[in-house]
Amino acid sequence: MTVKERITALRARMKETGIDAYLIPTDDFHGSEYVGEYFKCRKYITGFTGSAGTAVIMQDMAGLWTDGRYFIQAADQLEGTGITLFKMGEPEVPTVHEFLKKNLTQGMCLGFDGRTVSSKEASELEKMLDENGVSLSVDHDLAGDIWENRPVLSCEPVTELDIKWAGESRADKCARIRKAMEKKGADLFVLTSLDDIAWLLNIRGGDIHCCPVVLSYLVMTKTEIRLFANEKAFQTDVLEALEKDGVTLFPYDSIYEYVKTFKKDKKVLLCKKKVNSRLVSNIPADTRILDEENLTLLPKATKNPVEVENERIAHIRDGVAVTKFIYWLKKNVGRIPITELSAAEKLYEFRSEQEDFIDNSFDPIIAYGKHAAIVHYFATPETDIPLEPSGFLLADTGGHYKEGTTDITRTVVMGPTTEEEKKYFTAVLRGTLNLGAARFLHGCTGVNLDILARQPLWEMGEDFKHGTGHGVGYLLNVHEGPNSFRWKIVPGGNAVLEEGMITSDEPGYYREDGFGIRHENLMVCKKAEKTEYGQFMCFEFLTMVPFDLDGVVPELMSVRERNLLNDYHAQVYEKISPYLDEEEREWLKDATRAI
């Protein structure tokens, strides 16, 4: 079926079930950023393939909301479908909730699959729409009803993460979380975020593409831990190890019945932003719910010394692969046929040669020329273009290693570029260097520091429409909270930067139909000196790959900025050159020369 035919079929099911508007988020049953093939209902209905977006279907309209990363991509993919693009955050553009409040009136019904909407959002919708006399119907998977040949739920093998990689045993982690439960006065802890469960139990899987997680739910009490997952994914030795640490396995879907047995005198701690609305609604009404952040959130984000040291190793290995890739690109562009897709395959080949490499940490963004102006462009056979010996190639890629997860962006100068392009290339690089060199008092958040990355562009009256940085998991999700860099204050989203947090530093600049630039390093937060004013903090760059000096205008940089770049490049040469052949090493020596 075409997108138009799918929407027609969905509207027919809506009529049958008395639903006037149907909400289709991107989420799976666990609030994951990226989802398995089974859960891609929004993509199936709309044809939009971006990782973030929400669709609303009514009888007389269809709309898709997405953020600035995807404006260009969404406009292209929605063309001819009859779906209206709502550019989130733009002036005069209503939010999904504002649109629903305005367009749903007395007696109408909003429907959605309650397993794909958080309890918090469902409550907000219910309260808002109740004022209009609008009801909710949350037990229908209407998109799934019309999905022909829908993929099955993933069930990839589960493995244990050895303590030499994790740095802390499963038993010790569970003991820590139980102490936190006790402090909160909680009898039960309901955990449904897949990366949190994987972190807590020191297990990894493959149920989401490029995310080594296991489809599962978890309930912890003072005496037991129930894991709800598909038994077929677990080898006997993994099950026995889990049981030894007090973890018992139950069928994946059985949690929805289990939570109905919670007693009224018990206090249940869960995060309504993370747990889906159907699960929470199944908990007896007289059970007291403590709506708190997941107790695993901060322990997971603050990497222990073993994890940090392992990450340094992972980034050297990744740095070798990416450095070899950049050298190969510059040597061969214009001499042999290279396209965006074949370049991505070549980079995967270089990474695969590295010890302990597992997989990409996300689908690679290899964007040449005007494609680089699309912030999260993914090449397909239909969009793939050849690389030419001119302009910029933006390569935003990453890998999973047993030692951790990487995420790096380099903008490679493929040949002649304009002075204007070099001006922006240099401005973005200055932002990356200045944020990475920050020294700040403990207690600062990413909001306090974000201006360091944006200032060079703001001075030019320019900006970029995405966050400056995100947290990164340890052999887990490449996007991990709560740490981030952004200039807008988001309620509940401004975490203090703590020792051990790994965050990306990735300002950019994008000229629609022209070019795109982004420079990204990962960095770990560390303690610096302590004075009478308090504990100072700093960052250490983990990423070890040269920035392309062919795009840099030294005269546009301060002496301090040039010194920062030279010092960084000296580190890159020292750590990466031993793993290169003679020809590559000579190239790297020039690529990291002092300016």
Task: Describe the residue ranges of each PLM region.
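Active-site neighborhoods and metal-handling regions in enzymes and metal-associated proteins
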Residues: 1-595
